[in-house]
C-alpha cells in the first residue's frame, strides 16, 4: 500500500523554523502538490496549542515557549523524541479529520507493537498511553476510568496535535524514545495536572532514535494511505 508520501528526514531541526516551513508549505500547496512527511527531533522547547492555558506552564525556566496554531494544549519537545509532521491533502486522501487522527494513533500503536509494547487510546485525550505497571500487557483498558483521575496507572508516550487548513494537515505527532523527561514536570502535559510522561527507555525498550523514527515513518506511510 503506497501513499505517495515522500518522507524527508530533517534530523535535528529548529522548532520555530520548522513550524514556519510547515505553514508556508501548506499555504503554497496546490491540488497537485505531493504529500510529505517530515521526520525530525527538536532542541528543548515547550509548544502551546490554541486551547492552551498559561497556568498549565508551571515553570519553564530557560526553555523557550512557542505559541502555535495547532489543536491541544502545552507539550514538550526535546532530543530523543521522534517528531513526525504529515503534510496531507485530506480531500485527496479521501478521509476526514477524525479518521486522520485515528490513523495517526494507529501508526503509533503499531510502532509500539513492533517493539513489543502495547499502547492504548484514552477517550477524549488524544495521544497514546501505556500501562506503567506492565507496558507489555495486551489486556485492553476496561471499565470507566476513575473520575477525576482518568490516567491512573497510565503514562503518556506519544502526544498528538494537528492543524487542518483548506483540507491540508500540518503539525503532527511526537513519540518519546530516550529523552530527558524532567521538563514534562514543569508543565501540565496536554493540560492534565499530574499526567506522567514516559519514553521507550523508561519502560525497558532499548532502541535508537533512528530505528524508532524508521518504524514510525513506515507505519505512518502505511496507515495514512487513502
Curated annotation (Swiss-Prot):
Q: Per the record's keyword annotation, is Cytoplasm included, yes or no?
A: yes
- Read off the PANTHER family from this record: LIPOYLTRANSFERASE 2, MITOCHONDRIAL-RELATED, OCTANOYLTRANSFERASE
Native species: Variovorax paradoxus (strain S110)
Q: What is its EC number?
A: 2.3.1.181
Q: What is this protein called?
A: Octanoyltransferase
Question: What PROSITE patterns does the record point to?
Answer: BPL_LPL_CATALYTIC, LIPB
Cellular compartments per GO CC: cytoplasm
Q: What else is known?
A: In the reaction, the free carboxyl group of octanoic acid is attached via an amide linkage to the epsilon-amino group of a specific lysine residue of lipoyl domains of lipoate-dependent enzymes.
| List of residues binding substrate | 70-77, 159-161, 172-174
Any GO BP: protein modification process
List the residue(s) that the UniProt entry marks as the site Lowers pKa of active site Cys. 156
**Gene name tied to this protein:** lipB
Amino acid at each position: 500500500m503506497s501513499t505517495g508520501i515522500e518522507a524527508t528526514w530533517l534530523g535535528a531541526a529548529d522548532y520555530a523554523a520548522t513550524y514556519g516551513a510547515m505553514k508556508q508549505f501548506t499555504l503554497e500547496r496546490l491540488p497537485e502538490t505531493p504529500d510529505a512527511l517530515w521526520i525530525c527531533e527538536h532542541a528543548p522547547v515547550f509548544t502551546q496549542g490554541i486551547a492552551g492555558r498559561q497556568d498549565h506552564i508551571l515553570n519553564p525556566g530557560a526553555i523557550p515557549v512557542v505559541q502555535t496554531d495547532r489543536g491541544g494544549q502545552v507539550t514538550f519537545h526535546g532530543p530523543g523524541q521522534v517528531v513526525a509532521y504529515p503534510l496531507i491533502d485530506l480531500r485527496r486522501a479521501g478521509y476526514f479529520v477524525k479518521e486522520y487522527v485515528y490513523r495517526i494513533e494507529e501508526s503509533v500503536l503499531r510502532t509500539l507493537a513492533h517493539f513489543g509494547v502495547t499502547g492504548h487510546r484514552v477517550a477524549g485525550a488524544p495521544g497514546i498511553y501505556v500501562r506503567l505497571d506492565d507496558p507489555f500487557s495486551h489486556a485492553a483498558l476496561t471499565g470507566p476510568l476513575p473520575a477525576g483521575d482518568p490516567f491512573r496507572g497510565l503514562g503518556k508516550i506519544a502526544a498528538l496535535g494537528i492543524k487542518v487548513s483548506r483540507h491540508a494537515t500540518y503539525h503532527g505527532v511526537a513519540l518519546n524514545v530516550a529523552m530527558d523527561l524532567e521538563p514534562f514536570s514543569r508543565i501540565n502535559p496536554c493540560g492534565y495536572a499530574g499526567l506522567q510522561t514516559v519514553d521507550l527507555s523508561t519502560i525497558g525498550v532499548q532502541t535508537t532514535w533512528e530505528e524508532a523514527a524508521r518504524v514510525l515513518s513506515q507505519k505512518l506511510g502505511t496507515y495514512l494511505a487513502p
